[in-house]
Amino acid sequence: MTTMLTTPLSGWSQLSLSYLTLTVGALALVVVLYISIDRFPAPRWLSKKYQLIGQKDPASTTSLECPYSYIRQIYGHHHWAPFVHKLSPTLQHDDPAKYKMVLEIMDAIHLCLMLVDDISDGSDFRKGRPAAHRIYGPSETANRAYFRVTQILNQTTTGFPHLAPWLMQDLENILEGQDLSLVWRRDGLKNFPTAPSERAAAYQRMASLKTGSLFRLLGHLVLEDRSMDDTMTLVAWYSQLQNDCKNVYSTEYAKMKGAIAEDLCNGELSYPIVLAMNAPDGHWVELALQSPSPRNVRNALRAIRSDNVHQMCMAELAESSSSIQDWLALWGRKEKLDLKST
């Protein structure tokens, strides 16, 4: 029987082996961490939205006393006035009280919807400025929105009762569309159609309720009939489509919002997202909606910004705008849609 002789490692060799073991372990840990971070959504408390804390004293950010005044400063008072003039060039002269009331209604409904929408989306910015709830807090912002809408409903009912039915019905439709969008976000795709044509139709119906009803409301208030419904619906669809496309195709818009592909990261459907679900690699879009990890979002954006999906969106924009150029000139939103798949 032979005896195996082992030579103890020198102190230097032991130190080198320990260092090598630590290095390999550290590298393995880095790889595991990278894979985990890349494949799983960040905890909500780690996200920028939860690190951003609004000013304790809103006066240090703005001299305005409430969220509604703040967002109204961003968009301007009576920002629907050009549309009112186009619908009824003589209304301001013929019935100045109604003219002013229509503009107050449109400001209140439109801007208050934005206040609540920014809370729902967790948006940090609105047109390059801090979102109202980042300054005043979500509770005060939401309550002020409800308060202002209630004021408008009361003023319309008492001062312009013939306009109240139009306002109530269209506001109900707007909120139905918004509710449908939020339910899709909550439940994921299990209650969303699977056929491509049905998906596009379902999304357009939601947009017609949420955005279309806002534009149709303007025609109803000014003209007190439905004669402009088709035109207003088309203008609204273009507006929704343009906003959807800016969210994923515009560097300018991303800078103003402080986020890239905010809809996708929030699990919210948009027209490019709906189209991309049926494109090659569309499974990444569905994965990103379910779990917006960096890896899933990155691959989903590659599908959304693919030439095929981008071209379909641009074609829909061109088709929907062809007969309403005079109205779009009043809308005046022209961010460049310059982001495509690399």
From Swiss-Prot:
GO terms for cellular component: membrane. Glycans are attached at residue 154. It is a single-pass membrane protein. Mg(2+) 1 binds at residues 117, 121. GO terms for biological process: alcohol biosynthetic process; isoprenoid biosynthetic process; mycotoxin biosynthetic process. The gene is penC. Belongs to the FPP/GGPP synthase family. GO terms for molecular function: metal ion binding; prenyltransferase activity. Its EC number is 2.5.1.-. Isopentenyl diphosphate binds at residue 110. It holds the Pfam family polyprenyl_synt. InterPro entries: Isoprenoid_synthase_dom_sf, Polyprenyl_synt. It is found in: Membrane. Keywords: Glycoprotein, Magnesium, Membrane, Metal-binding, Transferase, Transmembrane, Transmembrane helix. Prenyl transferase; part of the gene cluster that mediates the biosynthesis of the indole diterpenes penitrems. The geranylgeranyl diphosphate (GGPP) synthase penG catalyzes the first step in penitrem biosynthesis via conversion of farnesyl pyrophosphate and isopentyl pyrophosphate into geranylgeranyl pyrophosphate (GGPP). Condensation of indole-3-glycerol phosphate with GGPP by the prenyl transferase penC then forms 3-geranylgeranylindole (3-GGI). The chain crosses the membrane at residues 17-37. This is Prenyl transferase penC. The keyword Thylakoid does not apply.
